[in-house]
Design a protein with these regions (language model features):
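Short alpha-helix at the nucleotide-sugar/activated-sugar donor binding site of glycosyltransferases
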Residues: 235
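Nucleotide-sugar donor-binding catalytic core of glycosyltransferases
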Residues: 1-229, 240, 244-259, 269-304
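Short helix-start
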Residues: 263-264
Length: 304
C-alpha cells in the first residue's frame, strides 16, 4: 500500500523493489533465503540494513548476476554498526553489485564510493497501518489515508496568513529510548529558549502536523538512527527542518533544510536570515517523492 503513496517512505521504498522479504520486520538481522532465491540480472533487491552482513554471508555467494541493492528499515548506521571497513570495501568492489542505495549511510562525504547513494527514510506510514495496532500517534489508518491527511493539512497551510518565526518542537517528549537519543538532550540544552516553541503536551500525529505547520521551522535532531522521519514530514508540510550537521548532509542537497554545526548556533537572527535567503532560492523537491527514487533504482538496474 505504501508504494501507492506520493511521498517517499521506508516501506514504500521496500515495496517498490522486485526482490524483498514478504515478512516485514524493522531491524531484523536475519535473511530468509527463500525470499532471495530469484535474483537475476538487474534485480532491484531490498535488504534490511540490520541484515546486510547476513545477506553478504548467505545470499551473495549464490549469485552470478549483477544487481541493485536498496537497504534501510533499521536505525543502525552503515557501515559502522554492521560491517568492518574491510568487509564494507570488499562488498562495494564486488562486480556483482551495480549500485547500493542506503538509508542511515554515515560514510564521510569526501569518501563516498561511486556505487553508493544516500537514501532518505522518508515518512513513516507503517507504524499505525497494522489493523488493531494502538499507538500514541493515532488510530489505525491505511498508508494512503495517512497521506491524504497530510495532503489536506498541506492544502490548509495555504490559507495561513503568517507563520511564526520560531522552531516547533515535539521531539522533547521522547528524549530517551532508542540509542538514548543523546542528540535530543543536547538540542534541548543548547538551543536558546526564545527560538523554540515546545509543544506542551504529547499529541497525536495529525495534531502535531497541524501545529507545526504554523511555524517556519521544525527542530529535527536524530531519530532512532541518524535520519529522522520528522525531517521529511516537515519538508512535506512546507516547513524548514533544522538538523545538526552530520555525514547525512548530502541527503539535503537542493532542499530547504537549515544545517547547523552546533545546536547553540541557532538564534533569532539566523532564523530570520535563513528564511530571507530560502525565500529567494529555487529548490528541487524531487527527492521527497517515491517516484524519483523508483526511477533512480530502475536507471541503475538498466546498467546491469
Amino acid at each position: 500500500m505504501e508504494n501507492e503513496c506520493i511521498f517517499v517512505s521506508s516501506r514504500g521504498i521496500l515495496k517498490s523493489t522486485n526482490i524483498h522479504t514478504v515478512q516485514f520486520s524493522s531491524s531484523n538481522p536475519l535473511i530468509l533465503l527463500d525470499d532471495y532465491k530469484n535474483i537475476t540480472k538487474g534485480s532491484i533487491v531490498y535488504v534490511c540494513n540490520s541484515a546486510i552482513k547476513n545477506f553478504i554471508q548467505t545470499v551473495l555467494p549464490t549469485l552470478k548476476d549483477t544487481f541493485v541493492l536498496v537497504s534501510g528499515d533499521s536505525d543502525v548506521s552503515v557501515p559502522d554498526d554492521i560491517l568492518s571497513i574491510t568487509e564494507f570495501n570488499s562488498f562495494l568492489e564486488d562486480p556483482r553489485l551495480q549500485h547500493w542505495f542506503c538509508q542511515n549511510l554515515v560514510v564521510p562525504t569526501n569518501s563516498i564510493h561511486r556505487k553508493l547513494s544516500h537514501l532518505p527514510i522518508g515518512l513513516d506510514y507503517h507504524t499505525i497501518s497494522s489493523p488493531g495496532n494502538q499507538h500514541p500517534w493515532g488510530l489505525h489508518e491505511l498508508p494512503t489515508v495517512q497521506e491524504k491527511q497530510l495532503l489536506e493539512q498541506l492544502e490548509k497551510n495555504k490559507t495561513l496568513q503568517q507563520k511564526v518565526f520560531l522552531a516547533y518542537s515535539n521531539f522533547h517528549h521522547a528524549i530517551w529510548g532508542i540509542g538514548q537519543r543523546g542528540d535530543r538532550q543536547e538540542a534541548v540544552n543548547k538551543i536558546p529558549k526564545d527560538c523554540v516553541y515546545y509543544e506542551p503536551n504529547f499529541t497525536s500525529r495529525d495534531v502535531a502536523w497541524a501545529h507545526q505547520s504554523q511555524f517556519h521551522y521544525v527542530l529535527s535532531p536524530k531519530g532512532g538512527g541518524y535520519d529522522c522521519h520528522r525531517t521529511w514530514e516537515a519538508l512535506c508540510l512546507g516547513c524548514i527542518p533544522i538538523v545538526k550537521s552530520s555525514n547525512l548532509d548530502p541527503l539535503y542537497t537542493n532542499l530547504p533544510v537549515l544545517i547547523v554545526k552546533d545546536w547553540s548556533d541557532i538564534s533569532q537572527t539566523l532564523l530570520k536570515e535563513t528564511y530571507e535567503t530560502f525565500s529567494k532560492t529555487r529548490f528541487n523537491m524531487r527527492t521527497l517523492y517515491l517516484s524519483h527514487w523508483v526511477a533512480r533504482f530502475k536507471e541503475e538496474s538498466a546498467k546491469c
